[in-house]
């Protein structure tokens, strides 16, 4: 029977949904205020919704209910689930394990797996990706990426390195460049013989 004068029915509350407040998902209409996960009641949008038949869920709840189960099928980083699967008729057997120390027993094993944070040669502190500038084959903080003599801020186009230190081209030429007549000025007095 046709629905005269009214809009579609909301998939959550079954009341009429008018066009101005309508969100469509999986062929069904919802009020904007009813577009919540049917398990945890979290507000949903087009990027966080996962539909199963006539029900809508957030991606985490959808994965818990309808995703693969068992060892090796975690919900991803940041999610901790203590669900044993009893509501699905699964038997969970936990084997006793010896207590382990929380601290890393072998730091070299940890650094081999996750990598050690790189250290800035100038200040000795860790250099993270957001502040990392490469110079002389080493990572530097943006604030430490300066000439060792004049303190001028450096860029990849005007940096030179010597013995693990960074210099601007001018300071490098003055201190380590060629010397003598024709190389940036006189470095020795030439005596005239009369």
Curated annotation (Swiss-Prot):
Q: PTM Phosphoserine: at which residues?
A: 95, 153
Q: What's the chief localization of this chain?
A: nucleus
The superkingdom listed in its UniProt entry is Eukaryota
GO cellular component assignments: cytoplasm; cytoskeleton; cytosol; nucleoplasm; nucleus; Z disc
Q: Tell me the GO molecular function terms.
A: actin binding; actinin binding; identical protein binding; metal ion binding; structural constituent of muscle; telethonin binding
Q: Where is this motif: Nuclear localization signal?
A: 64-69
State the InterPro entries in the record: Znf_LIM
Stretch list, region Interaction with TCAP:
1-5
Keywords, A to Z, come to:
Actin-binding, Cardiomyopathy, Cytoplasm, Cytoskeleton, Developmental protein, Differentiation, Disease variant, LIM domain, Metal-binding, Myogenesis, Nucleus, Phosphoprotein, Repeat, Transcription, Transcription regulation, Zinc
Protein's job: Positive regulator of myogenesis. Acts as a cofactor for myogenic bHLH transcription factors such as MYOD1, and probably MYOG and MYF6. Enhances the DNA-binding activity of the MYOD1:TCF3 isoform E47 complex and may promote formation of a functional MYOD1:TCF3 isoform E47:MEF2A complex involved in myogenesis. Plays a crucial and specific role in the organization of cytosolic structures in cardiomyocytes. Could play a role in mechanical stretch sensing. May be a scaffold protein that promotes the assembly of interacting proteins at Z-line structures.
What is this protein identified as? Cysteine and glycine-rich protein 3
């Amino acid at each position: 029977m046709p629905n005269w004068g009214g809009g579609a029915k909301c998939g959550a509350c079954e009341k009429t949904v008018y066009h101005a407040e309508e969100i469509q998902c999986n062929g069904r209409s919802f009020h904007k205020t009813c577009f919540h996960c049917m398990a945890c009641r979290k507000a949903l949008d087009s990027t966080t919704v996962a539909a199963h038949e006539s029900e809508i869920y957030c991606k985490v709840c959808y994965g818990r209910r309808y995703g693969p189960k068992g060892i090796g099928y975690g919900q991803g980083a940041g999610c901790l689930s203590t669900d044993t699967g009893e509501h699905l008729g699964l038997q969970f057997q936990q084997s006793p394990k010896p207590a382990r120390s929380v601290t890393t027993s072998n730091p070299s094993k940890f650094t081999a797996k996750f990598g050690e944070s790189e250290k800035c040669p100038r200040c000795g502190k860790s250099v993270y990706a957001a502040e990392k500038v490469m110079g002389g084959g080493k990572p530097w903080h943006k604030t430490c990426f300066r000439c060792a003599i004049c303190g001028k801020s450096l860029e990849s186009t005007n940096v030179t390195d010597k013995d693990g230190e960074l210099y601007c081209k001018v300071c490098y030429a003055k201190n380590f460049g060629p010397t003598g007549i024709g190389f940036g000025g006189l470095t020795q007095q030439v005596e005239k013989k009369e």
